[in-house]
């Protein structure tokens, strides 16, 4: 995130605006071709009115405890990308958050003040419902999937495997493994993100992911953290 604190984030964005700085928030997943296709087909109305959004985001292995201690926690460090993706796809603001989670992978993560497994339910202003699940450890690889369900159908963005070859033999069919690192999965999105930002600078245009997108994601993440600690839904008031 831009910062772990909303007030400091707001002041940062005010300074950026005051000084005329080109500013793009690093939500690289918006530049992933699969997720862009998902957004495009939603906007074309291929599945009608949106009803339910489901996002799965699971890392292959937890980061070092030294990182966990300064990360801001799973909602601000990891799930914040999914909060932004939810806004990107639904094109509406989250008004209610309910979070549940626990320490199921490594007790050292809990001792560092964080959790390693979480599920969040979102309610949007337009009535769309969303769920996001995060895990710090999926033993089978980097698991990144999205499903959007609507009045006229459903669209899924499945995992991107290391190649498209499937081995079939006497022991069955065997798919290639999933990427084991986020840079492997999202390499092209990082490149596209940088190219698009350079174009904004060269052509003096507005970046695709602006400061307010970062602010809104932080707001949702902080609400999720509060919900987890309080064990109740948290309402989000959009006054920023």
Predicted segments — roles?
Residues 1-30, 45:
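Beta-strand-loop-alpha-helix segment that lines the small-molecule cofactor/substrate pocket
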Residues 8-13, 18, 125, 197-240:
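C-terminal helix-rich "cap/oligomerization" subdomain common to oxidoreductases
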Residues 9, 35, 82-83, 191-195, ...:
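A general structural signal for well-ordered alpha-helical segments in protein cores
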Residues 13-22, 36-50, 149-150:
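Basic phosphate/pyrophosphate-binding loop/patch that engages nucleotide-derived ligands
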Residues 22-24, 54, 98, 131, ...:
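Structural detector of well-ordered beta-strand residues that form the stable sheet scaffold
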Residues 52-55, 189-196:
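Generic alpha-helical secondary structure signal
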Residues 65-129, 135-140, 212:
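Rossmann-like dinucleotide-binding domain that binds NAD(P)(H)
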Residues 108-114, 125-192, 210:
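NAD(P)-dinucleotide binding in Rossmann-like oxidoreductases
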């Amino acid at each position: 995130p831009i910062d772990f604190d909303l007030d400091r984030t707001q002041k940062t964005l005010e300074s950026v605006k005051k000084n005329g700085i080109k500013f793009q928030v690093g939500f690289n997943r918006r530049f992933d071709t699969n997720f862009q296709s998902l957004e495009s087909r939603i906007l074309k109305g291929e599945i009608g009115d949106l009803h339910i959004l489901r996002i799965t985001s699971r890392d292959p292995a937890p980061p070092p405890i030294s990182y966990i201690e300064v990360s801001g926690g799973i909602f601000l460090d990891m799930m914040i990308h999914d909060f932004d993706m939810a806004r990107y796809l639904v094109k509406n603001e989250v008004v209610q958050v309910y979070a549940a989670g626990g320490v199921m992978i490594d007790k050292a993560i809990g001792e560092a003040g964080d959790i390693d497994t979480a599920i969040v339910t979102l309610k949007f202003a337009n009535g769309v419902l969303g769920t996001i699940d995060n895990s710090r450890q999926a033993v089978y690889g980097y698991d990144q999937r999205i499903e959007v369900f609507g009045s006229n159908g459903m669209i899924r963005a499945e995992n991107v495997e290391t190649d498209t070859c499937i081995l079939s033999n006497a022991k069955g069919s065997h798919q290639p493994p999933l990427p084991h690192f986020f840079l492997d999965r999202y390499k092209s999105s990082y490149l596209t993100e940088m190219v698009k930002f350079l174009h904004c600078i060269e052509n003096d245009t507005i970046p695709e992911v602006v400061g307010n997108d970062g602010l809104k994601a932080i707001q949702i993440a902080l609400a999720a953290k509060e919900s987890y600690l309080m064990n109740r839904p948290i309402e989000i008031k959009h006054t920023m």
